[in-house]
């Protein structure tokens, strides 16, 4: 391995190495994991969550493991065999945790959410396959080019029984009687899924190995990273592989196991770079160094710097292993013998022996470490996992409800089915018109949306009232210049008053019609959305309803526009009851000329046309009458126009639409056509039913697991 480079965006972290342990005669095939980073003598998985209203903290505290002998050191190993009384309690607690996640994966829950797992990634020729072979005890496909073409879930189960294997993919499940069958069956599975060429697939192959010689562990093996397409490989094969790898390693539930050869520059490793992209702080990444026997003389210090986290910092640190070389594989060196040679290599190496003593070297140590990491990760993930499954289950159930039941084949049943559909739709429309519909958070009811438009109408009336005051001066001046006869100054012209009033009213027509169109569109869109929600899976029924909604909305807009224009034509009469007008006129005069209640400056603010020493002029007098008249007119229009719009656009539209929907039931010959489902609806319903079933099974599995912890 060349000199370390600082090209990665990590600072160098100097961590105190574990103190070297005094060398003693050791058994390097330990039966219990040693929890690196845990407190002395124990490993605790804290968890505080509830299921079914019960606090599971007490039950999950049972996951506090004490795998070490009292007084023992972390570098020491206990002897192998049934006499080891500490392994059994550990195994009893570890296996159920891993089985829980494996059972959820077998149910297909990974289609819906990420499960806690360890993903193994590495560049091509990094030694990834050799590491997995050493952990599993079975030969995996080897060769040049892309060998792993599908994700492989490697489920290792430690059990005192003869070796057993099982491979499953798609609808195939095959029992294996001998480890030698594994490589051939994996190749067959990959050919069946990804084709017999060099393509890859995201579809998972599951390999379960049960043996007394394997650790309790589940790993996901992913294709090796390649940079250049070779031979018949697709030109974008590198991008395809990276996309597949990223799909797994980007999940927060995944521990990334990155395999890196000792004899390459760590800064050039694509696998570590990809892990850094999705895990910038290195919180869930473990580095595995391979091929230590290929390190050039004098470069051992570089490897030690990496192992001591001084080159590329990972919070979970590094392990180092020596697996079978190519010549040893050709010589058919057994995995058991390879493990003995690995231990002897580190034990006799002047530089790497310290790593063995610190518990950071050899495949058995790696197996221990990975088991501990996976169990800790699972325990931390359980509360979120249960919450996610519950939430997705509820969402899928609601989605299935919206899809509705399957359409019956019998004509009579179709009628009742359609009646029920229309009944639910009409009730939704009724709730909208009455302001009683159920809305989601941050959404507003239809009535509130319309009310906001009516509020803007009041603002329009106020703005026009202020605008008309400026018109008075201009209109009266125009009268004085053009039409004044023998009248003395100060006499009010009623014609001028009428002209100002009518001009003011005419300017309100367009804003009123604009508000009408806005409300029509709000109601039309809401009714349309309601039809889509109820009939979305039936294209003919939905389109028929949408057409009725559009037609009724257009008729409502036309009728409301006619009434609004009629209202403004009536307003041109300029009429008010004497008693009402007298009260309004008195109020305006008192407000305008009361010297006690008003400062002189306020008069100018309200009536900017008042000028000169005598406020009582023809302009002022007309202004008083205009204010008095529009006091009542504005109040009338503020309510009358919304009344017209609300009645025509909302209330009448509701009645017409509900009647039109019921009339659809009269055409029995159209039932089949109206209830013709979208082509994808049946498939969607089937998909949702399967999803709900597996999530219900997952919730049941989690509940049973929690109950087992409670005792």
From Swiss-Prot:
MF (Gene Ontology): GTP binding; GTPase activity; microtubule binding
Region entry G5 motif, spans: 322-325
Chief location bin: cytoplasm
Compartments where found: Cytoplasm; Nucleus
Protein name, UniProt field: Interferon-induced GTP-binding protein Mx2
UniProt organism field: Sus scrofa
Residue span of region G2 motif: 147-149
Compositionally biased residues, Low complexity: 66-82
Biological classification of the source: Eukaryota, Metazoa, Chordata, Craniata, Vertebrata
């Amino acid at each position: 391995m060349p000199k370390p480079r600082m090209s990665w965006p990590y600072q160098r972290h100097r961590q105190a190495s574990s103190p070297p342990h005094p060398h003693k005669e050791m058994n390097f095939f330990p039966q219990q994991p040693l929890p690196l980073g845990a407190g002395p003598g124990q490993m605790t998985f804290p968890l505080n969550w509830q299921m079914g209203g019960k606090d599971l903290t007490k039950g999950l505290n049972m996951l506090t493991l004490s795998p070490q002998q009292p007084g023992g050191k972390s570098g020491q190993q206990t002897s192998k065999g049934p006499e080891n009384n500490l392994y059994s309690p550990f195994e009893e607690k570890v296996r159920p945790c891993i089985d829980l996640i494996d059972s959820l994966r077998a149910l297909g829950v990974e289609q819906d959410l990420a499960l806690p797992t360890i993903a193994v990634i590495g560049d091509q020729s990094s030694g990834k396959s050799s590491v997995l072979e050493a952990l599993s005890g079975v030969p995996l496909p080897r060769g040049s080019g892309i060998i792993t073409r599908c994700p492989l879930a490697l489920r290792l189960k430690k059990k005192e029984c003869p070796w057993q294997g099982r491979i499953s993919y798609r609808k195939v499940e095959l029992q294996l009687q001998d480890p030698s069958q594994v490589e051939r069956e994996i190749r067959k599975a990959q050919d069946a899924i990804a084709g017999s060429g060099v393509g890859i697939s995201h579809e998972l192959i599951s390999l379960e190995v049960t043996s007394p010689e394997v650790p309790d562990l589940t790993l996901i093996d992913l294709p090796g990273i390649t940079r250049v397409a070779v031979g018949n490989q697709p030109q974008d094969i590198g991008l395809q592989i990276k996309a597949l790898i990223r799909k797994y390693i980007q999940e927060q539930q995944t521990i990334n196991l990155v395999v890196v050869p000792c004899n390459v520059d760590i800064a050039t490793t694509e696998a570590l770079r990809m892990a850094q992209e999705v895990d910038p702080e290195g919180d869930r990444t473990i580095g595995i160094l391979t091929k230590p026997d290929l390190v050039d003389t004098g470069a051992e210090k570089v490897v030690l710097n990496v192992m001591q986290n001084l080159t590329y910092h990972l919070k979970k640190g590094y392990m180092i292993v020596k697996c079978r070389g190519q010549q040893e594989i050709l010589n058919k060196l057994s995995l058991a013998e390879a493990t003995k040679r690995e231990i002897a290599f580190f034990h006799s190496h002047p530089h790497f022996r310290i790593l063995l003593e610190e518990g950071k070297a050899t495949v058995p140590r790696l197996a221990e470490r990975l088991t501990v990491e996976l169990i800790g990760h699972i325990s931390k993930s359980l509360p979120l996992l249960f919450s996610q499954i519950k939430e997705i289950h509820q969402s899928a159930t609601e989605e299935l409800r919206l899809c509705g039941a399957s359409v019956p084949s019998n004509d009579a049943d179709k009628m009742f089915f359609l009646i029920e559909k229309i009944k639910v739709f009409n009730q939704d429309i009724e709730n909208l018109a009455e302001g009683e519909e159920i809305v989601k958070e941050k959404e507003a009811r239809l009535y509130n949306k319309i009310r906001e438009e009516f509020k803007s109408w009041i603002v329009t009336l106020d703005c026009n009232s202020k605008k008309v005051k400026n018109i008075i001066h201009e209109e009266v001046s125009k009268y004085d210049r053009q039409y004044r006869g023998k009248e003395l100054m100060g006499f009010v012209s009623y014609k001028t008053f009428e002209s100002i009033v009518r001009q003011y009213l005419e300017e309100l027509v367009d804003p009123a019609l604009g508000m009408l169109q806005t409300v029509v569109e709000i109601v039309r869109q809401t009714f349309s959305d309601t039809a889509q929600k109820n009939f979305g899976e039936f294209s003919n029924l939905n389109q028929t309803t949408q057409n009725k909604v559009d037609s009724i909305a257009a008729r409502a807009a036309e009728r409301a526009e006619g009434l609004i224009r009629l209202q403004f034509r009536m307003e041109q009469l300029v009429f008010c009851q004497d008693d009402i007008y007298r009260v309004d006129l008195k109020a305006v005069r008192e407000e305008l000329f009361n010297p006690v209640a008003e400062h002189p400056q306020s008069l100018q603010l309200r009536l900017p046309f008042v000028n000169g020493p005598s406020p009582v002029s023809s302009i002022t007098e007309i202004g008083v009458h205009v204010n008095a008249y529009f006091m009542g007119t504005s109040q009338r229009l503020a309510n009358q126009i919304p009344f017209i719009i609300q009645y025509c656009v909302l209330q009448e539209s509701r009645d017409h639409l509900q009647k039109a929907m019921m009339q659809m039931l009269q055409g029995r010959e159209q039932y089949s056509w109206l209830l013709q489902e979208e082509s994808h609806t049946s498939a969607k319903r089937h998909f949702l039913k399967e999803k709900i079933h597996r999530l219900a099974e997952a919730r049941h599995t989690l509940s049973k697991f929690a109950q087992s912890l409670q005792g």
